């Protein structure tokens, strides 16, 4: 992994956290920091995340000239989701530099524009659509490799969660509002009508929620804020309830597991390729919508979700240990570093 370059973000977003963690794990020789103020909902920039690393800052989308300066002298470079300039892959190839992209299927432009310059390697961050991507682009051009997480980042949250007592306290992440109620918030709110168990449910969002998300239930508390330390989101809970309606990389699931929280999700890919069967909720296809291609939408079986919540209330602390073991074996730096070193 000599002379690696990495394109990074520093906003409070999934991409910001993902590229920050990859930087700390891979220790690239050079960074290209994308100041996303002009196009991201998250305006705060955290350039200090990358103190001690060499590189360049670009406001918005890099020009061909800026890419050539960034790539000069590198052996390979990696980016997440997008290169911010598709000429990056052509320029890298001209300079005999290997390129790779951690690609999310729903935002993969190559599904509708196969003529665009492609990286030498697609890295899939979840199992969702992995086989289809291999069929489209070749077995040797696509690999599954999830984003790394340092267990120490969530150590404090994990210790608090392991020690907490009393009535169960569950977390639901709305995050940044996405199309078609992606995280299944409305399904969860409907399921609450069918469970009388005693627990607290914290619904967290990064922005103000529509009226339909605001319901009167003594068990619900709303939290609408950004936090500087992602791990604080997962502190002092017993589980994450996230009945997602459509698939893709879900960093909150991975982060929750590292915090010692079991995660309740719909029984669809990639959830059912990661989580134990008993943590999954029956669901059915309820529609489709278009991103770069048609994406299936799933709705939870509401009464099954309510029963799963009742089941969760009765679980002892062993389920938290199981959650952390699952997170560590799949996402820890020590497990993933050799795999990244072998391909970059």
Task: Give the label of every model feature segment.
Residues 14, 159-160, 297-304, 313-344:
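A charged, aromatic-enriched C-terminal amphipathic alpha-helix characteristic of glycosyltransferases
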Residues 42-133:
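Extended catalytic core of nucleotide-activated donor transferases of GT-like folds
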Residues 71, 232-237:
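Short alpha-helical donor nucleotide-sugar binding micro-motif in glycosyltransferases
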Residues 111-113, 148-167:
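Acidic anion/phosphate-binding donor-loop and adjacent secondary structure
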Residues 120-134, 138-156:
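Donor nucleotide-sugar binding/catalytic pocket of nucleotide-sugar-dependent glycosyltransferases
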Residues 151, 163-216, 227:
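Conserved catalytic-core segment of nucleotide-activated headgroup transferases in glycan assembly
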Residues 245:
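Aromatic "clamp/platform" in nucleotide-sugar-dependent glycosyltransferases that forms part
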Residues 262-265, 272-275:
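Short hydrophobic beta-strand element within catalytic cores of glycosyltransferases
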């Amino acid at each position: 992994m000599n002379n690696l370059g990495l394109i990074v973000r520093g906003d409070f977003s999934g991409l910001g956290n993902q590229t920050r963690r990859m930087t700390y794990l891979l220790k690239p020789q050079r960074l290209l920091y994308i100041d996303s103020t002009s196009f991201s909902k998250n305006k705060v920039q955290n350039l200090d995340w990358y103190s001690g690393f060499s590189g360049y800052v670009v406001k918005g989308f890099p020009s061909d000239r800026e890419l050539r300066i960034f790539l000069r002298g590198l052996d390979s470079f990696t980016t997440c989701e997008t290169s911010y300039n598709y000429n990056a892959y052509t320029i890298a190839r001209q300079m005999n530099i290997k390129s790779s992209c951690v690609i999310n299927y729903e935002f993969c432009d190559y599904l509708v524009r196969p003529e665009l310059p492609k990286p030498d390697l697609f890295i899939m961050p979840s199992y969702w659509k992995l086989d289809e991507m291999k069929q489209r682009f070749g077995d040797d051009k696509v690999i599954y490799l999830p984003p790394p997480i340092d267990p120490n980042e969530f150590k404090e949250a994990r210790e608090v969660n392991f020690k907490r007592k009393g009535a169960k306290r569950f977390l639901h992440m709305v995050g940044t509002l996405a199309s078609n109620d992606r995280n299944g918030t409305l399904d969860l709110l409907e399921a609450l009508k069918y469970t009388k168990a005693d627990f607290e449910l914290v619904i967290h969002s990064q922005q103000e929620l529509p009226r339909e998300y605001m319901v009167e239930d003594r068990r619900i508390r709303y939290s609408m804020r950004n936090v500087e330390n992602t791990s604080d989101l997962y502190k002092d809970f017993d589980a994450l309830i996230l009945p997602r309606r459509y698939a893709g990389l879900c960093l909150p699931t991975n982060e929750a597991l590292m915090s010692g929280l079991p995660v309740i999700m719909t029984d669809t890919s990639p959830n059912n390729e990661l989580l134990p069967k008993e943590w999954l909720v029956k669901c059915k296809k309820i529609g489709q919508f278009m991103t770069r291609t048609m994406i299936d939408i799933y709705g939870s079986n509401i009464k099954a979700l309510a029963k799963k919540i009742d089941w969760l209330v009765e679980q002892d602390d062993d389920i938290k240990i199981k959650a952390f073991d699952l997170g560590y074996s799949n996402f820890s730096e020590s497990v993933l570093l050799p795999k990244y070193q072998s391909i970059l």
